Amino acid sequence: MVESAVDPQVQTQMCGMELTLQKIEEFRSQGAIAYDNSERKLPATQELKFGEADWIDLQPGSYLITFNEVVNIPRDVAALARPRSSLLRCGASLETALWDPGYRGRSQSLLVVHNPSGIRLKKNARLLQLVFMRLDHQAEKVYSGIYQEENIR
């Protein structure tokens, strides 16, 4: 269900699979959400570059992150994610959505740095644990939204 892992033996945990940091972007404009997706407008972002030895220092705020791994959710599975406890203990959290049956892509999440002193992250840091849940039966409909195949083309 997960491809392109940095180190599958390390990332495979008792209850799921850890996803690692590929890219960080900062928000540059406002987004818009309405009842249907016809008026959805995603905000502009700008990629932040990792510095010496692949480290980056982030100030408090919200960031869009992209993971290294490509996730493939079967028709009879859904997934939820939780931040790693080390991330929380450093004063940062991740906001995520549900991984629907049929979704395939290199997912993104919202990183929120709450620590007034910021946080330092290294490229490929393990940030999140994806937990897979088997459904009682295969989903009648599978994910077919705009994020299908995201960041892998």
Which residue stretches match the model-derived regions?
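DUTPase catalytic domain/fold
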Residues: 1-153
